[in-house]
Structures are given as C-alpha cells and as structure tokens.
Design a protein with these regions (language model features):
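Active-site residues of response regulator receiver
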Residues: 50, 96-106
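Conserved beta-strand scaffold positions in the cores of enzyme catalytic domains, especially
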Residues: 73-75, 155-156
Length: 191
C-alpha cells in the first residue's frame, strides 16, 4: 500500500517546516521523490491563522498531528499572509485568530482577524471557519462571538493555552469536516 504524505506550508520563511518523505512512499510528486506542490494540497487544505500570543503554540503541534492524514496546513501570521494563501490555494477549513494583525508593520493598530472572517465569508464557496477568541472582557467576547456567528463561523473557541487544548481543537475540526463535507475528504476518499 502506498502512503501519501504532505508537508506543512507557511507563507513566513522563518516558520517553514520541511518534512522528509518516508522511504518507499508515494509523495504525490509523480514518483520523483519530491513532495507534491503545495498549491495542489492534500485531502484537506487547512488555513491556520495565529497571532503569536504563546511561546509553545498549539499551531505548531496541530499540523504534525494532521499531516499523516493528508491534511496540508497553511499557516499565516498576518491578515496579508492569510489573504495570499486564500487567493492561491483552495481552503477547505479555516482557523481564524481574531487577534491576527493586518500586517507586521502595525500589529497593534488594526486587527486582521475580523477582516479575514469577512473575506472568507465573501468567497464564492466560503470554507467553514473555527474562530479563536481574543480573550478580552466578557462584553467584548460576546460581541466577537456574535459577529463571528453572523459571518457564518462554525465554532468559536477560547485561545488554546496548553497541549491538552489540542484535543478540543481536533474534535471541533472533526465535527466541522463531518458536517460540512458529509464524511468525505474534500480532496480525496472518505475518512
């Protein structure tokens, strides 16, 4: 049996992770031993936006857990990076951090997370989105949740703080995949 592997894709060079393909496995690169081009994706293309608020983030661990399943994680640290991913790659599920800056030059001035949600909602086929709250006041949390749900968010979750929070994120992604893609991988056979 052949196995297909993919790699985590990042639009930030200093966050790029390259994983060597397994020996004897089909890498999806036409038998040349090279990984498939990232724009082709795998069974599922996952946009991971992350505002960089934790030293050992779940966003580093999640792609390693999903990669053996054929999930390609596209990581973005700003709204501009997320926009570049969306315009170049079909996204099947998006994780949107509401604290995401628009760009590196103004991390505090404008937050790109809400704008990214609006951009995703305007897509011809909007992907289901999982929204990560900014952890502000209760009133602001309520406002963020309502705005996210109005824009079609599948789920709104608290900021993951520890590795145990990965289980919640994995369960939310599993439910999202089951509900929106009816038990089928968007880019391949059923799961």
């Amino acid at each position: 049996a052949l196995c297909r592997t993919t790699r985590m894709v990042s639009v930030r060079p200093h966050h790029r992770h390259h994983h060597a393909p397994p020996l004897g496995g089909d890498t999806g690169g036409g038998g040349s031993g090279n990984p498939a081009p990232s724009h082709l994706g795998g069974r599922l293309n996952l946009l991971l936006s992350y505002a960089g608020w934790h030293a050992d983030p779940w966003v580093d661990h999640l792609p390693r857990l999903l990669e053996p399943l054929g999930v390609v994680s596209h990581r973005a640290g700003t709204g501009r990076e997320a926009n570049a991913v969306i315009t170049s790659t079909p996204i099947h599920i998006a994780v949107v951090d509401l604290g995401l800056p628009i760009d590196d030059s103004s991390p505090q001035a404008e937050e790109g997370g809400p704008r990214l949600l609006e951009l995703l909602a305007r897509q011809a086929s909007p992907p289901p989105t999982v929204v990560i709250k900014r952890s502000r006041s209760h009133r602001d949390d309520i406002r963020d949740i309502n705005a996210a749900l109005r824009l079609g968010a599948f789920a709104v979750v608290d900021r993951p703080r520890k590795i145990d929070d990965l289980n919640l994120m994995l369960e939310v992604l599993r439910r999202c995949l089951a509900r929106h893609y009816h038990g089928m991988w968007p880019g391949g056979p059923s799961f």
